[in-house]
């Protein structure tokens, strides 16, 4: 069984890109924002902002970060690990958690195995704590996304090799591609 991964970091720092790369290792994911948009956010906001459909609501999420953060927190107010349990029931990656209280509730319930921070602070700003209260020090690992896409792929591969080795797991055949050999000595 694959270890469950919580992938976090500031907005637009590459979390979804990292999760897409993790699919080569057998993982599945859906952005937590997309999951929540489909589950309840679109229904709650469609009349307020005049969204024609869920896709339009989801595409506009960056303009309402604090509002989404608060809505997701309200969804979890009586059970801080609720969303994590729901997401991990369908996927083995939770991509995009933003609330530290929910983070610690899930960690205490051992809902995920590893928390991974995606960092791109050399190029992009950090978020205001009103929409992101998780901090890098809380996570088990950090993936550096301050270079190019090839380097990011190498960094993801290095981390996954470490995690798989520590768990006694074999890497999937899909990771034995020329892409991964390109950085073998770097």
Across the structure, where does each feature detected by a protein language model lie?
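Extreme N-terminal starter segment of soluble prokaryotic enzymes
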Residues: 1-5
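Glycine-rich phosphate-binding P-loop
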Residues: 6-22
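Short, acidic/turn-prone active-site loops that include or flank metal/cofactor-
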Residues: 10-13, 32-37, 118-126
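Short, well-ordered alpha-helical microsegments
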Residues: 15-16, 37, 99-104
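Post-Walker A helix-loop "phosphate-sensing" segment adjacent to the P-loop in P-loop NTPases
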Residues: 23-31
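ATP-dependent small-molecule kinase phosphotransfer cores
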Residues: 32-92, 98
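ATP-dependent NMP and nucleoside kinases share a basic, alpha-helical "lid"
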Residues: 84-133
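Small-molecule kinase domains that catalyze NTP-dependent phosphoryl transfer to phosphate-bearing small molecules
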Residues: 117-185
């Amino acid at each position: 069984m694959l270890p469950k991964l919580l992938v976090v970091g500031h907005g637009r720092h590459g979390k979804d890109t990292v999760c897409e790369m993790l699919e080569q290792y057998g993982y599945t994911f859906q952005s937590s924002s997309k999951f929540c948009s489909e589950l309840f956010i679109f229904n709650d906001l469609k009349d307020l902002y005049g969204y024609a459909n869920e896709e339009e609501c989801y595409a506009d999420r960056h303009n309402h970060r604090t509002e989404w953060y608060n809505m997701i927190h309200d969804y979890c107010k009586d059970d801080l690990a609720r969303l994590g349990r729901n997401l991990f029931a369908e996927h083995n990656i939770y991509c995009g958690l933003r609330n530290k209280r929910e983070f610690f509730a899930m960690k205490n319930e051992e809902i995920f195995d590893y928390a991974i921070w995606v960092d791109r602070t050399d190029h992009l700003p950090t978020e205001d704590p009103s929409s992101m209260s998780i901090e890098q020090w809380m996570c088990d690992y950090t993936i550096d996304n301050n270079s190019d896409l090839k380097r990011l792929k190498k960094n993801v591969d290095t981390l996954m090799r470490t995690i798989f080795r520590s768990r006694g797991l074999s890497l999937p055949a899909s990771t034995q591609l020329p892409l991964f050999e390109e950085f073998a000595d770097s």
